[in-house]
Each structure stands twice: as structure tokens, then as C-alpha cells.
Amino acid sequence: MVIGISYSQEIVVNEEMTAKHMGSGDLPVFATPSMIAIMENSSMKAVELHLATNETTVGGRIDVKHLKPTKIGETIMIKATLEEIAGKRLTFKVEAIVNGDIIGQGKHVRFIVNKTDFMNF
């Protein structure tokens, strides 16, 4: 695993991803919780092939700004780039981009854990 590895995915905003549907607002626009979930997923996917079979990553912190609204039907590219490795702590830069405009950005921290040990909480 090295600094700079990344994962990007494109999604098309649908009704289930809206603030109105999720209950985080009352307008049919891309919801902040949806953006965060996809940012976390992109971060997970960026490193999953670099882990042992008995390891995974779990989210520990997220600090993002949702800068602009996005309508149903618009395509969003969400990218996570690994910026720092500190033992089992991984820090990612996360971005959401629509037509070249950043609509969301921030940092996400994940931790490498042993799957079995983690589930024995």
C-alpha cells in the first residue's frame, strides 16, 4: 500500500439518494449522507486489494463540506485518494465532482482491522 493510490466511481443521482427521500432535508437534491456513504465506499475500495484476506477497513472519522446542490439525473464522480498512512490509520482526500465543479470535499479516516477480532466486540 502506498500514498497516492485512489479509487473513483461515477454515480447518477436517483430518487433514493435525495435529501427528501433520506430524511436529511425536504428537497429532491443529492443528500449529504449519500455523498458521505459513497466517499466512504470509494476510500474502502481504494485500499481493499492491498489488505490481507483477513483484514478490512472501517470508518473512523469524516470531515466533509457539501458545497453545491446536485439534481436527480446528474452524474457525480466521487474520488478517494490515500494521503497518509500511520500504522493502521489511513487518511484519504475525498472529492465529489460534477462537470468539473467540486460539489463536495474533505478528509476521511479509516482503520485497518482484523475481521474476526473486530466482530468479537
What do the PLM-derived regions correspond to, one by one?
Residues 1-30:
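Catalytic strand-loop segment that frames the active site of acyl-thioester-processing enzymes
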Residues 2-7, 83-92, 99-119:
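C-terminal binding/interaction regions
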Residues 13, 70, 105, 109:
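Long, contiguous binding/interaction regions
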Residues 64-99:
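Hydrophobic beta-sheet segments that form the core/acyl-binding groove
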